[in-house]
Amino acid sequence: MFEVVIGLEVHTQLNTKTKIFCSCATSFGEAPNTNVCPTCLALPGALPVLNEEAVKKAIAFGKAVNATINKKSVFNRKNYFYPDLPKAYQISQFDIPIVEKGELFINVKGENKRIGITRAHLEEDAGKNIHENNFSKVDLNRAGTPLLEIVSEPELRSSDEAVAYLKKLHSIIRFLDISDANMQEGSFRCDANVSIRPKGDTKLYTRVEIKNLNSFRFIQKAIEYEVKRQSEAWEDGTYEQEVVQETRLFDTTNLVTRSMRGKEEAAEYRYFPDPDLLPVLLKDEFLDIKIPELPDEKKARFIDELGIKESDAEVLISSLEMSRFFESLISQNLNSKLCVNWLNTELMGLLKGELTIENSPVDAQKLGVLIKRIEDGTISAKAAKDVLAFVFENTSVEIDEAIEKLGLKQVSDDSAIEAVIEQILNANADKVAEYKSGKDKLFGFFVGQTMKEGKGAFNPAKVNEILKTKLG
């Protein structure tokens, strides 16, 4: 039996307005090579100037994961050649990163586990190579975008743990609002270092790096395939030949990893301090940066203060947008449990395909009005589902307008309900007698008959109240 050893390196693009060492915009999707200047193009004489906002965002992350924030950190040149790296070196941090010795906690199959974070350092992103037909093109818009590289300890023992760690990290980054962490656009990318060893062995064996994984599903599949490949090689006696220190890519079509190149050692990059950048010396006020409420804190507050079930609270903190939507709902002085049900179950049940809570056709204000109409008895919960479906498809229609159009307004007028109840009781005198002699279950019969006669428009609470008075 083997034990799996996984360490993850995550590159997240920080959401600063400008690049890390120049004033070019960081906006995604612009025409190729338009967000560039002499600094990102590495023209002679162009000098880097550090973006203060990138430093603040790195510090915020460090505080969120209980890390040590170094008052002094140093930028280094990482030397290698690639077409999308115009300087032929990347400005990064090596021996003195801005953040080190952090931690976060994951929960897998009901068990909590601490995962150490070795370091988080600032660096610049490279450009992008685009291969079309027989040509390769280079877009340098991304070159110089600020990255925070977050390196975990090799303490993850399964693909499930790796995905749980990444989801937790992704959530923290989003709640801090230091990155949009959009995996599809490449602003949250993961490299997985995977090795195996016999159970009980503490030695670290040959690790393989799988590069640029950009979805939780692919990360899981890539790790599972690589573990299977290495395990089979060990059992077949071909481990030393088949498993070498290398970088592999994940084939998302066939769900296999393929060899890309040999894995470089740190010495091969010839790191040395960048002579164009002074060491970063942090003043005390930088270390006092306030960070927002994090997912675990928010979850605890929802449970303790609002009486929400843990499973529901998990859904509410599943994304920054979801928690913002919920907090916007409860800020309207609504019943928190009703809000949870109508958000987690009813609205989320309608959001399919490209629709997410972020671009939901029904916003928090509109859903809040619907919940108010349930609370004040204007409509029943059953009718409210029809109203929600209607305004979901007809976005320009307001809740009250939809209630009128659909004719779903409840009758709460005592005299109208009383008149119908009188008719039903008179027509069922025998059942009234049975009820009064102790057959309490007949109460449901009278409620059902009244609601049927009122064609579902009667306020159920009013019906119950009047029936109890009439039946004594």
UniProtKB/Swiss-Prot annotation:
Q: What are the cysteine partners in each disulfide bond?
A: none
Its UniProt entry gives the catalysed reaction(s) as: L-glutamyl-tRNA(Gln) + L-glutamine + ATP + H2O = L-glutaminyl-tRNA(Gln) + L-glutamate + ADP + phosphate + H(+); L-aspartyl-tRNA(Asn) + L-glutamine + ATP + H2O = L-asparaginyl-tRNA(Asn) + L-glutamate + ADP + phosphate + 2 H(+)
User: Which E.C. number(s) belong to this protein?
Assistant: 6.3.5.-
> From what superkingdom does this record's organism come?
Bacteria
Which InterPro entries does the annotation name? Asn/Gln-tRNA_amidoTrfase_suB/E, Asn/Gln-tRNA_Trfase_suB/E_cat, Asn/Gln_amidotransferase, Asn/Gln_tRNA_amidoTrase-B-like, GatB, GatB_C_1, GatB_Yqey_C_2, Gln-tRNA_amidoTrfase_suB_CS
| PROSITE patterns linked | GATB (PS01234)
Q: Does the keyword Nucleotide-binding apply?
A: yes
The record's listing under Pfam families reads: GatB_N, GatB_Yqey
Any one GO MF term held by the record is: asparaginyl-tRNA synthase (glutamine-hydrolyzing) activity
The UniProt keywords, alphabetically, are: ATP-binding, Ligase, Nucleotide-binding, Protein biosynthesis
Might you name a Gene Ontology BP term for this protein?
A: glutaminyl-tRNAGln biosynthesis via transamidation
Which Gene3D superfamilies does this chain map to? 1.10.10.410, GatB domain, N-terminal subdomain
**NCBIfam families in UniProt:** gatB (TIGR00133), PRK05477.1-2 (NF004012), PRK05477.1-4 (NF004014)
Output the HAMAP family linked to this UniProt entry: GatB
State the oligomer form and interacting partners. Heterotrimer of A, B and C subunits.
The entry assigns this protein to a family as follows: Belongs to the GatB/GatE family. GatB subfamily.
* Purpose of the protein: Allows the formation of correctly charged Asn-tRNA(Asn) or Gln-tRNA(Gln) through the transamidation of misacylated Asp-tRNA(Asn) or Glu-tRNA(Gln) in organisms which lack either or both of asparaginyl-tRNA or glutaminyl-tRNA synthetases. The reaction takes place in the presence of glutamine and ATP through an activated phospho-Asp-tRNA(Asn) or phospho-Glu-tRNA(Gln).
- What is the designated name of this protein? Aspartyl/glutamyl-tRNA(Asn/Gln) amidotransferase subunit B
What gene codes for this chain? gatB
